[in-house]
Amino acid sequence: MALNDFHVSEPYTLGIELEMQVINPPGYDLSQDSSTLIDAVKPQLTAGEIKHDITESMLEMATGVCRDIDQAAAQLSAMQHVILQAASEHHLGICGGGTHPFQKWQRQEVCDNERYQRTLENFGYLIQQATVFGQHVHVGCANGDDAIYLLHGLSHFVPHFIALSAASPYMQGSDTRFACARLNIFSAFPDNGPMPWVSNWQEFAGLFRRLSYTTMIDSIKDLHWDIRPSPAFGTVEVRVMDTPLTLDHAINMAGLIQATAHWLLTERPFKPQEQDYLLYKFNRFQACRYGLEGVLTDAYTGDRRRLADDTLRLLDNVTPSARKLGADSAIDALRLQVKKGGNEAQYMREFIADGGSLIGLVQKHCEIWAGQ
């Protein structure tokens, strides 16, 4: 199967996708009513898109192409308002978080959608288990070779993005001991983790052609790598973040990725090599397991450093780019988060340690998303 040509897009433009939980009070389990909400809100949208994801308990908010984080925030805020209004009318709740803390995957209904039904046929129960919730950020690129360079550059910071956004410590009613348990769900998929090594767009087209021989890959959307090029949009898409509990944090994460992309493509601080990925999964695991307390290991020198310290270094490196893009408020907020030493997974555990229940935790998440 041939790959679409890489669509030229304005560099550093943004697109944000948020996979939201549809909740059924008063038990605060996942609902199976996303279709009802989507039908209710679609006529009210003036920008962006609200659509299905894999199962009926998931609802995806997606911006259009945005110049900066302020425009993205305005679009997401407008969508948030109409979704919350419709959810209230249908006695449902909406919240973020990378996993629902006590839902049972066996109860999840795959959407009546040709692509998702085909995916269910290919992957069986793994698709129902993939009822987890992430944030994806698209960044515009001028051409395919820039996209491949950017993908490799951003891959250096996958642990940083995971640790900052980690919001999935609970699954199936248990504390997983992970800050981000969501990504573990995808470990059984054949396309889990980093994209196989290529050095340019021509090589990527050849890789895609060979992957399509498996009959499991019809389009780029069927590849679930941590970061992937999206030729139809002319973007690189970062897919490792948990859906945050607040819109503000989602915007901050998008601002960081936009600023990092600008820094990478203007400064070209790395010469990508296949060996860069030698310890990729080990460092990724550290971020998932321990969050900002994880330890990174350099694939070339063996040097080890705290993820929190390296994240502060990244924030310093991208600050000039953030100023040029109007994303400096995002970098300031994330720097404060790192210095305080926390993420949303830590907040969730503190809520439970203070005597809260998992039901109460989901209720609190719905209140947070609604701004209460």
From Swiss-Prot:
InterPro entries: GCL_type2/YbdK_subfam, GCS2, Gln_synth/guanido_kin_cat_dom, YbdK
GO molecular function: ATP binding; glutamate-cysteine ligase activity
EC id: 6.3.2.2
Catalytic activity, as annotated: L-cysteine + L-glutamate + ATP = gamma-L-glutamyl-L-cysteine + ADP + phosphate + H(+)
Keyword vocabulary terms for this entry: ATP-binding, Ligase, Nucleotide-binding
A GO BP annotation: modified amino acid biosynthetic process
Similarity annotation: Belongs to the glutamate--cysteine ligase type 2 family. YbdK subfamily.
Quaternary state and interactors: Homodimer.
Role description: ATP-dependent carboxylate-amine ligase which exhibits weak glutamate--cysteine ligase activity.
Protein known as: Putative glutamate--cysteine ligase 2
Biological source species: Salmonella heidelberg (strain SL476)
Gene: ybdK
